[in-house]
Amino acid sequence: MRIRKNGAEMLARAGRSSLLASVAAAALSIAPAAQAVVPNDNLSPEDIVDGTDVNGVGIMYRDDGFVCTGTLINPRTVIFAAHCVNDLSTPDYSTVNGGVPVAFAFQSDARPGLIDWISNGYRTNTALSVYNVNNIAYHPDSLDPPALSFLYGDVAMATLDTPAADVPTWTMLFSALPAPAAINETTGTGYHVTVTGYGRTGSGTTGNSVGIDFRRKTAENFLGMLGSLDDIDS
C-alpha cells in the first residue's frame, strides 16, 4: 500500500523540485527544460500572471511531484512534451494498481484544484477545471539517447477521463506559416508569438530565477529561429 502525503505537502515538494516547463506559443510550442517565461525589467513575474482564468492551456500534475504545461486540442486530448512523462512506461500512469496518477488543471491559479485532486482520491472536478488522465502516449524517439529526452520527438498526448466541455481548445496548424511582416535583428524570424505556461520565471536581469507557483504566466516575444536541428552547427 502506498502512503500518500496530503495535498499541501505534495505541492510544496513539487515547488522545491527541479521542475520542467513547456510552453504554448501561438497554437503550441514545446520548449526544453531550460526555457522559462522571463519578462524584461519593466515587468515582474507578478505582472505577467495570466488574467484569463480558463483558456485551454493547463498544468499537468503527476502525483510523484512533477509538473509541466499542456494544451487542450479537443475536449478529451491534451498535447504536451514527452520529457514530462517518458521516464516511465505508459502503463505506469494510472490511478489504480499502484500507478502514478496524472491530471491536468486549466485554471490560471491551479493550486486549489490540484490540492483538491490529491486530497480527494485523484478525481476529476469540473468545477475547478481539473481532469484526471486515463491514458498517455509519447513519441518513442524521445527515448533516443542522442535526443537527451527532448531534442526531437518530444511530443506526448494524454486522454482525459471526462470531456473538458467548458474549456476552450486550441487548433493545431499543419500548414506553412504566412510570411512575416518584417525580418531584422530585432524581430528575428519576424514571427511575433504569445508564450504562456506554468513554469519558472524571472526578470530580464535575474533570468530564470523564480520557482513554480502554479499560476499561468503570459508574455510576448519574437521567434529567434524557425527550423530544424539540421540547421544548427554541432
Regions found by a protein language model. Name each.
Residues 178-212:
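Short glycine/Trp-rich loop-beta-loop segment that forms part of the substrate-binding cleft
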Residues 2-7, 11, 21-78, 87-100:
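Protease-domain processing segments flanking chymotrypsin-fold serine proteases, especially trypsin-like
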Residues 54-56, 66-68, 74, 100, ...:
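Residues that flank catalytic or metal-binding motifs in active/ligand-binding sites
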Residues 217-234:
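Extracellular trypsin-like serine protease catalytic domains
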Residues 38-52, 95-182, 208-212, 227-230:
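Conserved catalytic-core segment of clan PA serine endopeptidases
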Residues 37, 47, 63-66, 174, ...:
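Helix-boundary and membrane-interface capping/anchor signal
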Residues 58, 70, 76, 80, ...:
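Terminal peptide-recognition signature
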Residues 65-67, 78-79, 84-86, 163-166, ...:
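Solvent-exposed loop/turn segments at secondary-structure junctions
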